[in-house]
Every structure is written in structure tokens, then in C-alpha cells.
Amino acid sequence: MMKLLRPALSVFFLLVLVTAVAYPLVVTGLAQWWFPGAAQGSLVTQDGQPCGSVLIGQTFTRAGYFQGRPSATADTPYNAPASSGSNLAVSNPALDDAVKQRVTALLQANPHADAPVPVELVTASASGLDPHISPAAALWQIPRVAEARHLPQAELRRLVDDNTTRPLLYFIGEPVVNVLKLNMALDARQKG
């Protein structure tokens, strides 16, 4: 019995050492060396303090800020530990009610909008944490932000364009705007 148990335990502890200790340490070390920002969560700092991550959306409710997609996380919006497949089915009446409420709220907050409400402003992403919106959704909000900030709409269009990330190849993905980065650029523009 001991003849069989000793090699089995040796292999078990060796694999635990390799897969649970050595491999994570090597991968973490390489990530810290090659991609230090991403390895730390892609944090964004303002005045030396972390104020968010470019990977997780945030709630912006003031009229002078661009708003992102609604969060689908439970209890607290954009709560990463609570992220899950939380979207309702298209056939669920609760989804229809939530979308109607969001459309009504957005139209009240954006009375000068001249196009239908972009779909991503009223529907959550699969994770409920998406930090991006389409350039069209950002452009749709420009009249409200321009009025609240007393800025010309043309300047905000340029700011949206400057903060639009385009895919490397035009047929892989869509252009997106990171709402946190856009709002930080807007604040920096107002300060400067």
C-alpha cells in the first residue's frame, strides 16, 4: 500500500507546487514586467489618486457628464463582484418596463436630442460593467453636456472623436468611447 501511496502523494504535491505556486508567481511576475498598468487593473488616476478603471463602467448622473450603459449588477451599480449573467430575456415584461423607464428618463434629461435614444443607453451589457458606449451614443448626449458645461457642441464633437477607440482592422469590432476617459478629458478641458 505504501509503495503505491508514496509516488501518488509525491506527484500530487509536485503538481500543487507547480500549478498553485510556481505558475501563478511566474505569470504574475511577467505581467507586472511586461504590462504593469494592465496587471494592476488598468487604473486611472487623478491628482495621484485612483479614480476608476478603464475596464469597469461608472455611474455619471450630473448633466455635465456623458453617461454610460446602465449597470445590471445587483444592489450597487457597477459592482464587479456582483457581475453575472443578469440580463432579462427579451420576452420578459420587466425588461420592457425597465427600458421604457430609462428611455423616459433619458428623454427628460436630454430634451434637445434630435434622434431616438441609442439602444446601449437603455440596455445593460452582458456583464453589467461595460465602460464603453458607441460614438453615436456619445454624440446623442452632446446637447445636454454642452448646455450644462457652456461649451460649443463642435468642441464636444472633437472631444468625442479624440476619445474614440477604433479597431485595428475595420471589420473586427466597432469604434467605442470609454465614458470615464471621455469625462476625465472633459474635466481636464474645463480646467485648462
Curated annotation (Swiss-Prot):
Any coiled-coil regions, as ranges: none
A Pfam family annotated for this UniProt entry: KdpC
Principal location listed in the UniProt entry: membrane
InterPro entries reported for this sequence: KdpC
The keyword Repressor is assigned to this record: no
GO CC annotations, alphabetized: plasma membrane
Key words, A-Z: ATP-binding, Cell inner membrane, Cell membrane, Ion transport, Membrane, Nucleotide-binding, Potassium, Potassium transport, Transmembrane, Transmembrane helix, Transport
GO molecular function: ATP binding; P-type potassium transmembrane transporter activity
Topology relative to the membrane: Single-pass membrane protein
Residue intervals passing through the bilayer: 11-31
Subcellular location: Cell inner membrane
Domain of life from the UniProt record: Bacteria
Transmembrane among keywords: yes
Subunit structure: The system is composed of three essential subunits: KdpA, KdpB and KdpC.
Function field: Part of the high-affinity ATP-driven potassium transport (or Kdp) system, which catalyzes the hydrolysis of ATP coupled with the electrogenic transport of potassium into the cytoplasm. This subunit acts as a catalytic chaperone that increases the ATP-binding affinity of the ATP-hydrolyzing subunit KdpB by the formation of a transient KdpB/KdpC/ATP ternary complex.
Annotated family: Belongs to the KdpC family.
Entry-linked PANTHER family: POTASSIUM-TRANSPORTING ATPASE C CHAIN, POTASSIUM-TRANSPORTING ATPASE KDPC SUBUNIT
Protein name per its UniProtKB record: Potassium-transporting ATPase KdpC subunit
Source organism of the structure: Sodalis glossinidius (strain morsitans)
